[in-house]
Amino acid sequence: SKSSTETPLSYNQLNYKENLQRFFNSKPVTAPTQLDPVNRDSSYASTSREDACSAISPDHGGECSGGSGSSGNCTTNSNIRMSSFTNTSITGTGTSGCGNSGGKLSESGPVEVGGAAADAGPSLAADNSIPPISVTLTESLLN
């Protein structure tokens, strides 16, 4: 007789392939759609992400007025709380304007950001553009 130290296979182990095939053929519902956190309110989450992206996009719409050597007024159409740049300098060093340039300032002097006067103006990057903003959306912000 032949001896073995292995445990004999059970009925379920012997029929694993058939059981697996029968499971997938029955097309089970593993997670109901209304309880799936990813798809629970996808239209809202998608809209919120698009709104957030458009709010921090440097290519936002805007209106500007002002010319060479004058103070320029730029109003953005974004949802960021900082809604306008107003250059109050009388002695300009170039033309003022924003358009879709991301709110670049080309004149020196005090700058009002959202109505609060600042002596040195906003902190700008080396190329005189507004530095990128990093926003992390968490689930608590989307609810």
UniProtKB/Swiss-Prot annotation:
Presence of the UniProt keyword Phosphoprotein in the record: yes
Chain intervals for the UniProt region annotation (Disordered): 25-130
Low complexity bias: start-end ranges: 71-93, 114-126
Compartment(s) of residence: Nucleus; Cytoplasm, Perinuclear region
GO BP of this protein: rhythmic process
Post-translational modification: Phosphorylated with a circadian rhythmicity, probably by the double-time protein (dbt). Phosphorylation could be implicated in the stability of per monomer and in the formation of heterodimer per-tim.
Keywords: Biological rhythms, Cytoplasm, Nucleus, Phosphoprotein, Repeat
Superkingdom of origin: Eukaryota
Record-level GO cellular component terms: nucleus; perinuclear region of cytoplasm
Subunit structure as annotated in this protein's UniProt entry: Forms a heterodimer with timeless (TIM); the complex then translocates into the nucleus.
Role description: Essential for biological clock functions. Determines the period length of circadian and ultradian rhythms; an increase in PER dosage leads to shortened circadian rhythms and a decrease leads to lengthened circadian rhythms. Essential for the circadian rhythmicity of locomotor activity, eclosion behavior, and for the rhythmic component of the male courtship song that originates in the thoracic nervous system. The biological cycle depends on the rhythmic formation and nuclear localization of the TIM-PER complex. Light induces the degradation of TIM, which promotes elimination of PER.
Protein name from the UniProt record: Period circadian protein
Taxonomy of the source species: Eukaryota, Metazoa, Ecdysozoa, Arthropoda, Hexapoda
